[in-house]
Every structure is written in structure tokens, then in C-alpha cells.
Design a protein with these regions (language model features):
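Catalytic adenosine-cofactor/nucleotide-binding cores of aminoacyl-tRNA synthetases and other
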Residues: 1-166
Length: 166
């Protein structure tokens, strides 16, 4: 659905006329985005999931099944608070965030490359699993110790890419 504010914003932007006219449908989506920008809480989602297995989980986090993480509910409005979620040994990433043979300028996950899991840790890809058709079914990565977001020394390892996960 659309918020009342977004419909008002669309009407304000397009105006009214006695003559017939067309308004691009994308204008409604833009008005909705602009209306929700200041008030909607943020979250992460993965549309086309690919399993990410953190192979050295126990070595870094011990017997902890889940490590707590947090992020601002809205990046520009700290008064909206913080959201909490857990990081575990098996996660889901966007399939497009991994490449067997990366093109030039690809800063996401591929063999030997390091990326930050958004609001999480830095991981380095060590391999992947494929089915009989050659489709990637899982990616294996190792966690780099002491790189958890929000902790001292978290930015000691420089990475070029940050990816979304659930």
C-alpha cells in the first residue's frame, strides 16, 4: 500500500490541470520512498539467498551459537533507537554478492577476497560448494578475529566491500 503522505506528496509534485495528462508510475514510487525516508526503520533482507558457512566459528567465538549484533534503527535518526539481531555460524547472503570468477571492480565475495558483513565481522572467502549442474550452493568463509563492528580494532582490517546478510 501507499501512505497518505506519499499520495499528498505526489499530488503536490504533479499538481492539477484541466487538461488530461499522464504521470509516470515511477513518480508514485519515488514519492513513497521520499515519504518513508525519514520515518521507516531499517532492516536487512536477502532476495536470492546463498548459504554462507563460517568455517572457523568455534575457533573465534567458542561455543556461542549466536553472537549479538546491533545497528541503528534509522541511520540519520538516532532517537529511533537500535535494533538487535544475531550472527551465527551459518548465514544467508545475496547470490549476486558472490562470484566464482569476479569481473574487474567486483569488491564483494570471491575466493581469497575479504568483505565486511554489514554490522557484523570481516570474512575471507575460502571456497564454495556446487551441485552437479555447477550452480553454487554454499560459500565457505573464515571469520577474521577482532573485526566485529563496534568493537575496538574492528577497522584494523581494511576491506573494499560490505555485504548484506540474514
Amino acid at each position: 500500500g501507499y501512505t497518505a503522505g506519499s499520495l499528498r506528496l505526489l499530488a503536490e509534485r504533479t499538481g492539477a490541470s484541466k487538461a488530461g495528462g499522464w504521470t509516470d508510475y515511477a513518480s508514485l514510487d519515488i514519492a513513497l520512498r521520499d515519504d518513508l525516508e525519514g520515518q521507516a526503520h531499517r532492516a536487512m533482507a536477502v532476495i536470492d539467498p546463498l548459504r554462507l558457512e563460517l568455517v572457523n566459528w568455534r575457533g573465534v567465538f567458542g561455543d556461542a551459537a549466536i553472537v549479538p549484533c546491533s545497528a541503528p534503527a534509522h541511520p540519520q535518526r538516532p532517537e529511533l533507537g537500535t535494533r538487535h539481531f544475531g550472527l551465527g555460524a551459518a548465514l544467508w547472503i545475496e547470490r549476486d554478492d558472490f562470484a566464482l570468477t569476479p569481473p574487474k571492480g567486483f569488491f564483494r565475495l570471491f575466493a581469497g577476497n575479504k568483505v565486511r558483513l554489514k554490522y557484523g565481522v570481516v570474512v575471507e572467502c575460502v571456497g564454495c560448494s556446487q551441485d552437479s549442474a555447477g550452480r553454487v550452493t554454499a560459500v565457505q568463509a573464515r571469520v577474521l578475529p577482532d573485526t566485529r563492528s563496534g568493537t575496538p580494532g574492528a577497522d584494523a582490517v581494511k576491506v573494499k566491500g560490505t555485504i548484506t546478510w540474514v
